Amino acid sequence: MLPPKHLSATKPKKSWAPNLYELDSDLTKEPDVIIGEGPTDSEFFHQRFRNLIYVEFVGPRKTLIKLRNLCLDWLQPETRTKEEIIELLVLEQYLTIIPEKLKPWVRAKKPENCEKLVTLLENYKEMYQPEDDNNSDVTSDDDMTRNRRESSPPHSVHSFSDRDWDRRGRSRDMEPRDRWSHTRNPRSRMPPRDLSLPVVAKTSFEMDREDDRDSRAYESRSQDAESYQNVVDLAEDRKPHNTIQDNMENYRKLLSLVQLAEDDGHSHMTQGHSSRSKRSAYPSTSRGLKTMPEAKKSTHRRGICEDESSHGVIMEKFIKDVSRSSKSGRARESSDRSQRFPRMSDDNWKDISLNKRESVIQQRVYEGNAFRGGFRFNSTLVSRKRVLERKRRYHFDTDGKGSIHDQKGCPRKKPFECGSEMRKAMSVSSLSSLSSPSFTESQPIDFGAMPYVCDECGRSFSVISEFVEHQIMHTRENLYEYGESFIHSVAVSEVQKSQVGGKRFECKDCGETFNKSAALAEHRKIHARGYLVECKNQECEEAFMPSPTFSELQKIYGKDKFYECRVCKETFLHSSALIEHQKIHFGDDKDNEREHERERERERGETFRPSPALNEFQKMYGKEKMYECKVCGETFLHSSSLKEHQKIHTRGNPFENKGKVCEETFIPGQSLKRRQKTYNKEKLCDFTDGRDAFMQSSELSEHQKIHSRKNLFEGRGYEKSVIHSGPFTESQKSHTITRPLESDEDEKAFTISSNPYENQKIPTKENVYEAKSYERSVIHSLASVEAQKSHSVAGPSKPKVMAESTIQSFDAINHQRVRAGGNTSEGREYSRSVIHSLVASKPPRSHNGNELVESNEKGESSIYISDLNDKRQKIPARENPCEGGSKNRNYEDSVIQSVFRAKPQKSVPGEGSGEFKKDGEFSVPSSNVREYQKARAKKKYIEHRSNETSVIHSLPFGEQTFRPRGMLYECQECGECFAHSSDLTEHQKIHDREKPSGSRNYEWSVIRSLAPTDPQTSYAQEQYAKEQARNKCKDFRQFFATSEDLNTNQKIYDQEKSHGEESQGENTDGEETHSEETHGQETIEDPVIQGSDMEDPQKDDPDDKIYECEDCGLGFVDLTDLTDHQKVHSRKCLVDSREYTHSVIHTHSISEYQRDYTGEQLYECPKCGESFIHSSFLFEHQRIHEQDQLYSMKGCDDGFIALLPMKPRRNRAAERNPALAGSAIRCLLCGQGFIHSSALNEHMRLHREDDLLEQSQMAEEAIIPGLALTEFQRSQTEERLFECAVCGESFVNPAELADHVTVHKNEPYEYGSSYTHTSFLTEPLKGAIPFYECKDCGKSFIHSTVLTKHKELHLEEEEEDEAAAAAAAAAQEVEANVHVPQVVLRIQGLNVEAAEPEVEAAEPEVEAAEPEVEAAEPNGEAEGPDGEAAEPIGEAGQPNGEAEQPNGDADEPDGAGIEDPEERAEEPEGKAEEPEGDADEPDGVGIEDPEEGEDQEIQVEEPYYDCHECTETFTSSTAFSEHLKTHASMIIFEPANAFGECSGYIERASTSTGGANQADEKYFKCDVCGQLFNDRLSLARHQNTHTG
């Protein structure tokens, strides 16, 4: 019968027991979450009810309660109110699930209801089990095992256990394993595993003890029946107001006492199900039980297979958990029992007290000793001592740690071992995680019977719980056979981590097991590699990851993203594991591969290195060092290391590495990486000139370009080693500078096509070398990242006798019509005209850089088509030598740069194509070719010849659409196509970086990596220069020819106005413009044909212009280089002597000159023959020769830089005034050249400090000019973050910047990167800084360095004057000795006091120039007073005589008084005679006086008045005061102790009393214009006009 209804009123205080029906209601609310079987919960609970497994140690009563609860869920008594039906169904089911050994006996008893059946079973248990610790285990094991098999999770916490239990089928306990017929649960992903317990064997085992329990069975039966009847009676006493609800509540309350505890213990083990994990609570904690250690909890609460049918195991695990807490569990159980039937009378309780006490004792025993005990034996049969002994012997660590002692120090039993190694491990892990020691200890040692035998491996077990765990292990093994995996919740993962040696994951191939899925995954790699080895095609990319493992990974870690190896398709959870794995594919045979590759390269006569993308890929996957220094052969893993290394060679001699191979390295782009990924597949593509095979036409075109470069250098013994990369067109162009070869057979046109598949006629070797002695014409098409289709635009180029010019395009769809316009200059001729297709700042949407080059005569055309795909690179003008020169120099290069338009227009053929031949060929002049080649062999220096300029016209092209093969994603900015959207995304970032600055050079070279900043010209080209350069056209002979729209034409029109006398004719129509230069304009050196951007006409880069020097006609791409070059002409001493008959045009960007540096030294010094990679180097070098002549006396020949700075600096001064943008700044003291004024300032600080040192030490110190530059260069290698606003120099930290800023405080000008020593002509002073005046001649200077230079001239003059004066003094010495003494005595007696002021007025200047002379003079002056009275007077008169000399004799130069003290120090008598010859007797007397002073020198001990300024001594205060006034007048124009001033000899004392008398012969000359002035003030005013 059902329990009484009123019991629910006694249970509300059990807060720890949740409402089970409510929990089950949750299950009904979300049935799919838990069972996945649809909305029919009734059927679900029916299956749970039928499949509940009986677990012996749970006890029959608890099993009954569970069955009743499941039946309620199944039959739903709220709709079916027949309690009898429920009771009968429960009884029927109960009889079905009881152990087989008990069925005959129970059926013989014929129980009428469930209560009687329970009584029978309880009596049976008591008869055959001891009362001590092990009392309830054996029977409970059998019963509970079956209960588990037949239960399924109906309610909240126990939902999982019950549901899982019922999966194994209802009849597993009654039928043999092979006859189980229950259907597989829809949620189950594994086959219906047979985990039933061979209870028949156990029946015999328990029947041996049945007699011992008979005595208690009947009594217990009667008491239980009576107690249950009382419960029923109490239930009937309740009001029938809501019978169904009350019944359900009663069942829930009853179940909550026991069933909840069972379910709580393991419901959290199925954490994969959210509803169960939410409802589950740790019962031992919630009910006040002693909490067991977390490690032990995890071991038995985890590792349950999702589809495991042995649900009874879950109940076993919780019972073990509960039984751990001994005393609290007992107390709780007793209180639960008392609360379970609270309304029973005391008599009833006493009546059933024996039974209840026994069950409580049994409950306490298995609760307290479940982990340490086995079977429950009656104390009459087995002593406690024996039980404890069994505990010690059979207990083992549930954590799987292998410890040999439990918490109380008892020795522990090792886990059972299964047949195979895998099963051993699985058994250990299973037993440790899912079983408790009670199962392993449950068999007494003295029992020989092993009733439970495993059908899989034949192992026998005496304890059913161990047998259950063992079968679960087999279940897990079978999971792998069907490709299923466990639900690896966090708890399961922790179990696996905590188990040592417990291996659960088995390899299908070899059967090896692992305790972690990651270990299994790593193990599978071995098989995967073996599979790959067996594959014939090593490139096979077939996935080899077995699906079970892959799904296992997903289920274990719950991730959707894995790292997959592209070679073998193996997946990894971490990128680091993938990297390690990929080393296997690429690391083993790397040496052999490299050696084999080099052998192949040597066979075909060139070193062909893969592109940097492949290098990066190889580096990523363990390749050896891929960056090799071609100077010393050292290899590096990173390009940055190579760059740093190559600086060592560069610092030693930046010009000794000429001819070295290019080692330019790049950071590969994504598209290139994708292309390089297929590079190794070696998809063949024929090439006419080489023996190489290429995967794509782009590779072929790349290789063809390399062949062109190779052939260009064959005649000179160069063999090019190129790290070629599609996107990096800058590098390619840098190595395609066509050099004429000295051998005749090599001097042929060489034409390259970018795609062999197109209709463009690719010249064969015969065609290429058919031409005669002329320099080859290289049409270099920079390959795109992906294969581009190209074809001839203007028709096939037929090789002619003169030259061959092949036009090629990247367009694969539209033939473009190209037209050429010619600019011819009759006075000159360019044998070389290079068209550079310059990418616009905003990449054009059309990528058809087809340009035609045509030379009228003596010219050769070369077309450089920029990389149409790499729009981010601004391709600057390369030094492309052009033959021809002006009358005073050889200028070979006509750089024609074409900027693509953003919206190109179709070019209309017909107009302005006078030079274009009918057959699409170009006429290439043949004269002077041999001479040009000779000159080119000498690196760009050509003899004077008539100039005939070949004008190339960049035409607008039709709208292009790129659809290369395999390209699907097109860039809207530039039209480049990509096979992958990710590549397009990466590519579009390039345009984003371009927009702020117009264009950016992303170029990496051996010297440095250029940061993505505004591309500078050689040193400092800036925005202002870009805007104002067009206004300077007249000065710099700049010419433009554009092919753009009206805006561009208007710009050309403005230029035409500014160049009227130079007659730059421009024919502009809507779509094309032809620039025609009139013949006869010999000054027109460099026609710069500039295709500007239609959308952004304001972004004309000065890099597209060529500036011409008016003095020599030399052309420069860089305005700063022209400014720097013009300073050479400003040196008068070099104008006539220097043979500047050679000219160079150098690239305008750092990246260009870097490429030059990496192997192509094109600039040669005509004096010494030294070659340079950059024209700026040549300029600097030429200054050495100039300085050799100018500063030969000082031997200063340091004048060129060894390295360029790491980063180009912003030239703010050039932005303000481009005319002042000097490429180098010179130190006027030592001639040292600098790139930035900050370096010059730092260098000048050394000079200033040295000047102070000279003043203090009285000696000149040698200055090493290169120290500052070396330090500057070293500092440039560091990353600069803080920039100086004055000069643009950057510093690593703000402290250095603060120190640097102080340098500019004392500077008269705003020193910028382009400041030169002549900048004061146009730039105003920063502030009112005093002029520096020369004491010798009175000239004023703005800067102390100029004054220092000026004083050096005085020193030379003084030396000459001293030599002449010494000769004159020797002749007059005799006469001076006769006349001077008498005159001196007379003068001393009369003019002592009057002469002192004037004497002292002259002496300060003397002493300022020569302090050492005056150091001796005071002694002579002061000696007189202590000796004879007349002598001091005479001595005082002597200076007076000197001072009066200018007054008395106006013809006497003022410098006479200056030189006299020095001569007196050397030869007093001689010096005395020198002035006497030109002066009167008083003057001579004054000169003679020092000699007499020296005679009385020993009589003076100390002076009366000592001047601290000049250390002069005076005998009277009046003379001393007058002397001080002189010092005050001397510092009007000269700041005291000014840096950079040097003491020198004063020949003319401008402030002396004789200054006015000397005015006629005294002048002041302006250093700028040479104008003379009578006084310094006029000179200062005049100089202000120069400075503004």
Curated annotation (Swiss-Prot):
> According to the UniProt record, where is the region 3 X 7 AA repeat of P-E-V-E-A-A-E?
1397-1417
Bias type Basic and acidic residues, positions: 143-152, 160-181, 205-224, 293-304, 588-607, 868-881, 1071-1082
Q: Residues annotated as region Disordered?
A: 128-231, 265-304, 317-347, 588-608, 839-889, 905-929, 1056-1104, 1396-1495
Instruction: List residues of the SCAN box domain.
Output: 46-128
The Swiss-Prot or TrEMBL record annotates one GO molecular function as: zinc ion binding
What main location does UniProt list?
nucleus
Keyword Lyase among record annotations? no
**Where would I find the sequence repeats?**
1397-1403, 1404-1410, 1411-1417, 1418-1422, 1425-1429, 1432-1436, 1439-1443
**InterPro entries tied to this protein:** Krueppel_C2H2_ZnFinger, SCAN_dom, SCAN_sf, Znf_C2H2_sf, Znf_C2H2_type
- Bias kind Acidic residues: ranges: 129-142, 1396-1415, 1449-1466, 1475-1495
Where on this chain are zinc fingers (C2H2-type) annotated? 452-474, 505-527, 563-585, 627-649, 969-991, 1107-1129, 1163-1185, 1225-1247, 1282-1304, 1332-1354, 1505-1527, 1564-1586
Intrachain S-S bonds: none
Please give the tissue specificity annotation from the record for this chain: Brain, glial cells, astrocytes, embryo, placenta, testis, ovary and uterus. In the placenta it is found in the layer of villous cytotrophoblast cells while in the ovary it is found in the cells of the ovarian stroma including the thecal layers around the follicles. Expression is highly repressed in glioma cell lines.
Q: Which keywords does the record carry?
A: Apoptosis, Cytoplasm, Metal-binding, Nucleus, Repeat, Zinc, Zinc-finger
Pfam families recorded for this chain?
SCAN, zf-C2H2
Q: Which GO BP terms, alphabetically?
A: apoptotic process; negative regulation of transcription by RNA polymerase II; positive regulation of transcription by RNA polymerase II; regulation of gene expression; regulation of transcription by RNA polymerase II
What are the start and end residues of every segment in region (4 X 5 AA repeat of P-X-G-E-A)?
1418-1443
Output the Gene Ontology cellular-component terms: autophagosome; nucleus
Cellular localisation: Nucleus; Cytoplasm
Q: What does this protein do?
A: Induces apoptosis in cooperation with SIAH1A. Acts as a mediator between p53/TP53 and BAX in a neuronal death pathway that is activated by DNA damage. Acts synergistically with TRAF2 and inhibits TNF induced apoptosis through activation of NF-kappa-B. Possesses a tumor suppressing activity in glioma cells.
Description of how the protein assembles with itself and partners: Homodimer. Interacts with SIAH1A and SIAH2. Interacts with TRAF2.
Name the protein family. Answer: Belongs to the krueppel C2H2-type zinc-finger protein family.
Q: What is known of its domains?
A: The SCAN domain enables PEG3 homo- or heterodimerization to control gene expression in a combinatorial fashion.
Q: What is this protein called?
A: Paternally-expressed gene 3 protein
Organism annotation: Homo sapiens
Encoding gene per record: PEG3
